[in-house]
C-alpha cells in the first residue's frame, strides 16, 4: 500500500508480479530516463496508475490496472518522449491512457509514443485521450509521432459529450497534435459515447486558451460492434486552428465496411479540411 516514485533518475527497472494495493498513486516517473516497468498489478489507485512527467525512455510491459474512483486514470504522460506501452490491461474509472504536453510542473513536447497489444476498459471518460493540457505561455508545444496498434477497447461509458470518444484528440492550451495513427483497433461496446472525437477547442474548465490544430491523423483497420453510438465529432476552432488531413481506411461498423462520412456517423463541423475515406 504505497507509491513507487522515480524522480530525476536513470536506468531503473521495476519488475515482478507484485501488487500495489490502494495507493494514492501507483508509480510516478518524473524528470527521469530509461525506466522499465514490467509485470506489476495496481489495484484501486486513488489517482494515476502510472504517471510520466518530463521523462524520456519509459517502457511499460505486462501491467494490469483496476480502479473505481473518479480521477483514477490508468497511464498518463505529460511532456514525455520515447515511450513504449506493450501488453497492458487497463480497467479504469477515468481515462485509460492520456497524453498531454505541459501540466503541473512538467514542460515540453510529447512525441514518439507507441501503445501496442493492449486492452482498455474505461468506466467513464476516454479509453484514449490525446491533447487537452498544454502551455499557453509559450504556445509552441507539440504532440506528435504517436501510434496505437492492436488495441481492444471493451467499453466506453461517458454521458458528457465534451468528454466522449473511444479515440480522442482534443487539443487546447495552444497544443498542436500531428502525425498520429490508430491501427488495428477493435471496439466491442459503447454504452454511451462516441467512436471518434477530433476537436480543437477551448475548454474553460481546464484550458487557458484554444488548441492550435490537429493534422495528419490516420484511422486504419478499425472495427466496432456497438449499436448505440452517438455521432462522432470533427470540429476545428477557427480558420487558423483547423483539423486537416484525416484518413479513415477500412472502417467496419457492425460488420459493414464504411464508404462515406454519412455511414461513418460523423458530425463534421466548421474548419475541417481534407477528410478521406478509403
Question: What name fits each language-model region?
Answer:
Residues 1-278:
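Extracellular/periplasmic carbohydrate-active domains that bind, remodel
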Amino acid at each position: 500500500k504505497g507509491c513507487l516514485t522515480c524522480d530525476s533518475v536513470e536506468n531503473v527497472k521495476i519488475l515482478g508480479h507484485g501488487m500495489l494495493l490502494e495507493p494514492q498513486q501507483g508509480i510516478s516517473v518524473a524528470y527521469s530516463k530509461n525506466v522499465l516497468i514490467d509485470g506489476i498489478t495496481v489495484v484501486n489507485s486513488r489517482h494515476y496508475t502510472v504517471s510520466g512527467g518530463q521523462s524520456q525512455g519509459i517502457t511499460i510491459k505486462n501491467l494490469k490496472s483496476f480502479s473505481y474512483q473518479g480521477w483514477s486514470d490508468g497511464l498518463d504522460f505529460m511532456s514525455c518522449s520515447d515511450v513504449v506501452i506493450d501488453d497492458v490491461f487497463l480497467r479504469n474509472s477515468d481515462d485509460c491512457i492520456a497524453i498531454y504536453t505541459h501540466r503541473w510542473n512538467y514542460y515540453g513536447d510529447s512525441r514518439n509514443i507507441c501503445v501496442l497489444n493492449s486492452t482498455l476498459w474505461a468506466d467513464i471518460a476516454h479509453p484514449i485521450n490525446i491533447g487537452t493540457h498544454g502551455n499557453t505561455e509559450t504556445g509552441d508545444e507539440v504532440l506528435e509521432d504517436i501510434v496505437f496498434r492492436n488495441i481492444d477497447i471493451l467499453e466506453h461509458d461517458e454521458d458528457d459529450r465534451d468528454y466522449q470518444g473511444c479515440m480522442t484528440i482534443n487539443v487546447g492550451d495552444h497544443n498542436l497534435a500531428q502525425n498520429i495513427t490508430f491501427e488495428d483497433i477493435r471496439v466491442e461496446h459503447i454504452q454511451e459515447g462516441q467512436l471518434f472525437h477530433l476537436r480543437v477547442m477551448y475548454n474553460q474548465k481546464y484550458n487557458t486558451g484554444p488548441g492550435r490544430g490537429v493534422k495528419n491523423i490516420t484511422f486504419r483497420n478499425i472495427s466496432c460492434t456497438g449499436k448505440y453510438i452517438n455521432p462522432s465529432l470533427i470540429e476545428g476552432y477557427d480558420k487558423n486552428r483547423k483539423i486537416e488531413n484525416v484518413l479513415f481506411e477500412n472502417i467496419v461498423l457492425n460488420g459493414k465496411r464504411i464508404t462515406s462520412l454519412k455511414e461513418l456517423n460523423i458530425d463534421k463541423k466548421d474548419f475541417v479540411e481534407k477528410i478521406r475515406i478509403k
